[in-house]
Amino acid sequence: MPSQFNDNFVATDDDVGTMARVGMALDRELNGDSFQDNLNFQPRSGKREDFEPFFQDTPNTKSLSKHFHDFTMNASLETLPSVEKPRGRNMNAFEETSWNRFRKNGSLFPLSSPPISEPDLRPQALNETPDYRNRFLGAFKKQGVLDDHGNLKLDASPSFLKKPAEYTPLANRQNQNLAFDSPTEALPPKPTTPWRRNGFRSKTTPNLNSGKETPSSYKASARLMEQLGLNHSEPSVDFNNQTSYRLPNLTNLSSLIRDDTIDENGNAKEHDRLPELNTIPVASTDEQLFNAHQLLEKKFEILKRERNECNAKIDELQDKLELLTDAYNREKRRARSLEERMSKEMLTKLGESNVDDGMAASRYDTVKREKERLSEHLKSLQEQYEHIQSVYKNVLLDRESYIMRLGNKISENNELLNENRVLKEKLQTYLDKKESNVTSKIKSTAENSSKPLSMNEADERKDGLNNLLFENKSGANTKEMSNGTETAKENCSPQQDSTSPTSGYQDLVKELAKEIEMRKSLELKLKLSQSNKAGPVKHRKRRPKSKRRITGKVVFDSPNVASGVESDEGSEEISLDSEYSDILSDDGDFEKEKQATLPRRRSSSSMKGNKLAEDSYLNEAGFDWNQGTFHNGSEFGTTGVPDEPNEEELPKHVLKQVEHIINESAAHGVGKCNACHARQEDLIRGEQKVSHSNCLYADQTLRPSQPPSEALKTVVNQLTNELMELKKRYEKLSDRYNSLTPGYHKHKRQEIKNKLIKLIECMESKSDQIYLLYDVNVGKDFS
């Protein structure tokens, strides 16, 4: 059987010992002097304090104040245990304040320290404390240093109750070494025996794994937390002085896109004089790039000459400045020598006794006047010297500005050269692709022609060839129209001449165009045959009674409707006038239809032979763009007005592309258009000849009456003239605005400002229209 007692067992009553320790701690707390320092007391060395680990590491367990609050609740002072009553020697001057504090706070240990993680509460905890708490902290100020064992050297009993060690009982002598600083220290663990339970507490205090013992005072614990680095203080970050990084401008694009009228925030700058609005030509073709390059080279040479002239002027001014400085130094030396000589003469003459006073005075006056004259001459030389220096500085500044401008022009020239090189490469690749596509199409057509044809296909091929022969006959007029364009093509840059296709390439293109037209005619004939097989439509909408077909012409009831509109188009295509304005704003959807090139001119006989009319497009005036062009035996259009000699005509391929853009950008299809569908049915059934009393025939103006390039030129010239007029008016208003004094005429300045803003808006709209027309003219090359 194991022994009932072990070595660590203490043969005392646990409950009695615990209550004794609690009573002594309560005595010191109620006296109020428990935190005074006793300098006479010296702890004994070599002996461990009996109750040293008392109140140790109990932040998560029940404190003594909780225990005392529990068993003293709902009890009067007379019914309290004797341990808690102040009796005997405890009746002193601190009794009243101690019990008043007990009654107010409801706890024996009201001293609570703020959390260490909040450093802002430390000065408040130290400054706003009562007298007993100041005494409590004063002990740590005097003797708050950790010793070798990590304990605080504190005295727990008042000084006036101290007795010599030999007269003090053993129990009191042992209790003098206790340091009951705060109720947060833990009780010692109780021995666990099988026949008795733990006294006073149901649970043992958990032992925290800490390197040092937790000190009882707030100040010492805060210092310990700072030493251990557990104060949770975040590093201070200066958000006001953050380092900003700005990337360098490596592309130099900002100098090309920069607008001087707008600041960094996107607001318009306010100056005394509003900026001038000059249009910048956009170099979008090789010819324009070549011209821009030549202009830049000329400007570069002009700037070089100006720089050389400035250098020569600077050298001349430097030589002149050196001469003036030499003259100034000579005059200065001469004036000094004259002053010295005059002073010597005056001294010698005044020393002589036989000197005539009148002659000396007159000579003195002459010398004084000479001195004043020389001083004035010296001042004039100084002013001249300063003027020459200012001129020299201005010349140096001009030279620096010329150098900067020259550098900017050189950089722009290099960028244009690079852009020109890239465009050349793109053009070469485009031509190679075009040649490959043409050869592939020619091969495919040759293969198709080598195959045997059926009877229907042979008939269709014959009809297509007949139509093609008629178109070749009617195409003689188009050659006259393209004379001016061929002359303009010969005047192009040598770069374009070097990239022009050969004669064999042109023949291949012509053959391909013929093959496409033939296929188009075959497709139309096939559609016609299918519609004949299907038979007439039963439920067809009746056409308006006001329009009747009279041998291919339309009769209108009112004379206001008479215009250049054909009867085949009807009122459905007149509604397309609103779509004509979209041609200038949109770049054109060039892939709405798969057929890129359509036959542009068909005679009346070919239309009757095919019994199907092509779809056309009406412009703003209601005229058809797809009708043939007839020049009446002249080399100009129907207007009869020759081209201006100063303006350059667009080449032939440009005109074709413009016409293609105009035809393709119209949202119109033969299968979807009601008017064209009705026209096809009428052609199938046959024309109805109806007479009408008020017979007004429409003027059959053939379209295009002039080349599209000429029309574009006239519109652009009109818009540029309007823009120039607006600019002149803007300059007049700006001069008037600048003539007004800022001290007066506020209302006038406001009125002129509003007019200037409206003029700027008008000029912007005109410039946008010109820009869109240039897009129409240039965008056809990429279709």
Curated annotation (Swiss-Prot):
Chief place of localization: cytoplasm
Compositionally skewed regions (Polar residues) per UniProt: 201-216, 437-453, 474-504
Keyword Transcription regulation in annotation: no
Signal sequence bounds: none
UniProt protein name: Spindle pole body protein ppc89
Compositionally skewed regions (Acidic residues) per UniProt: 566-590
Record PTM Phosphoserine, positions in chain: S157
GO MF, one example: spindle pole body anchor activity
One Pfam family here: Cep57_MT_bd
Function: Has a role in meiosis.
Keywords, sorted A to Z: Cytoplasm, Cytoskeleton, Meiosis, Phosphoprotein
Localization in the cell: Cytoplasm; Cytoplasm, Cytoskeleton, Microtubule organizing center, Spindle pole body
GO cellular component: central plaque of mitotic spindle pole body; cytoplasm; mitotic spindle pole body
GO BP annotation list: meiotic cell cycle; mitotic spindle organization; mitotic spindle pole body organization; negative regulation of cytokinesis, actomyosin contractile ring assembly
Cited InterPro entries: Centrosomal_MT-associated, Cep57_MT-bd_dom, PPC89_CLD
Biased amino acid composition, Basic residues: 536-551
Classification lineage: Eukaryota, Fungi, Dikarya, Ascomycota, Taphrinomycotina
Keyword hit for Chaperone: no
Residue numbers spanned by region Disordered: 180-216, 434-458, 471-504, 528-610
